[in-house]
Curated annotation (Swiss-Prot):
It catalyses: (2S)-4-acetamido-2-aminobutanoate = L-ectoine + H2O. It comes from Rhodococcus erythropolis (strain PR4 / NBRC 100887). Its EC number is 4.2.1.108. GO terms for biological process: ectoine biosynthetic process. Catalyzes the circularization of gamma-N-acetyl-alpha,gamma-diaminobutyric acid (ADABA) to ectoine (1,4,5,6-tetrahydro-2-methyl-4-pyrimidine carboxylic acid), which is an excellent osmoprotectant. Keywords: Lyase. HAMAP family: Ectoine_synth. InterPro entries: Ectoine_synth (IPR010462), RmlC-like_jellyroll (IPR014710), RmlC_Cupin_sf (IPR011051). The gene is ectC. Pfam families: Ectoine_synth. Belongs to the ectoine synthase family. This is L-ectoine synthase.
Amino acid sequence: MIVRTTTEITDTDRDITSEDGNWRSKRIVLGGDRVGFSFHETTIKAGSVNEFHYANHVEAVWLVEGTGKLIDLDNNKEYDLAPGSMYLLNGHERHRVEPDTQMRMLCVFNPPVTGREVHDENGVYPLVEVPA
């Protein structure tokens, strides 16, 4: 059994802030935990514009705080987000998140991330194998 708190993760190598400071992700469960997924708490700043594309991962996102917009850049669709909203990027869609207020999201990635991935110039995380 693994038990962790976001308090103990804060300011460790599991606590990642984007280069532009727009978002912060606390990686609670990672690939090294060997459970087949990773689980993150991500906070995105109000008024920011954030473009992502997870070409190598499926991501499920559940919004627990805040409001804003999700723009599906592949299908030219826009969605309003509020607490209780969930979106699943099962088609590896390029997307943009535009918070009206600070958003706090709980995110699951499959395959799991290792924790040190950095978005490339296209917003993509590389697929990193977890060492045996």
